[in-house]
Amino acid sequence: GDADMALDLNPSETIVDLARDTNGISIDNLSSCCCTHASGLSVLASPSSPELAEYIQSNHTKAIIDVARNYYEYIILDCGCALTDPVITALESSDDIFMVNDVNILSLKRAKLCQNVLSQINQQDKVKLIINKNVKKNNVKISDFENLLGIDAYAVISSDLKTVNSSLNSGQPLITYKPRAVIAKDISSFANKLIMEREGTLTATTKKKSFGKKK
């Protein structure tokens, strides 16, 4: 993913540097390779060029997750669409798999194909359906995804290309760039729902400031 660019961060090291570190993967090495956003979020940047991704193997993915689990409350992995061996390892190590889909016929087809693959590796029960770029008037409905996949939508994110582009170009997260926008509220609701499921007794306001921070 491009989280570092979206957050206006300039990483000096990436996940490739961590994977190639001869001292192995430790919390010290992981921390030194991460960038820290003003919100407290730690970001491990993706490879600086596509060809470098070949240095990331399944054992690196597992080691990074295993180390990070002991130090971070929440770990978010932006795995993309290709189900490579390192990605499958990440999915197998995850508590939840958020399947993000735009509301169109191609996404509907891909969602079913993805679900079939996840079923083959016994990961289908982790899937939570996220509907992205939702608009009220559309030939493809949220219910089409729900009926085809046999699961309810976990979260629905409204379409607002103008606000998203402005947020990206400014290097600010949506929820701080334009917190009153419907799309920002949708994302906050999604995050708070996840937090409340994990830690039920805590309020959204209490946890919002520490989402993604170290323990």
Set out the residue ranges of the language-model regions.
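G-domain G4 guanine-recognition motif of GTPases
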Residues: 102-103, 127-138, 156-162, 179
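NTP-binding/hydrolysis catalytic cores, primarily Walker-type P-loop NTPases
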Residues: 169-215
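Conserved C-terminal guanine-recognition region of P-loop GTPase G domains, centered on the G4
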Residues: 110-123
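Phosphate-binding/switch loop-helix module in NTP-utilizing enzymes
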Residues: 46-87
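Phosphate-binding loop that captures ATP/GTP phosphates
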Residues: 1-43
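Beta-strand-loop-alpha "switch" segments that mediate conformational coupling across diverse proteins
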Residues: 133, 146-173, 187
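Conserved Switch II/interswitch segment of TRAFAC-class P-loop GTPases
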Residues: 94-112, 136-138
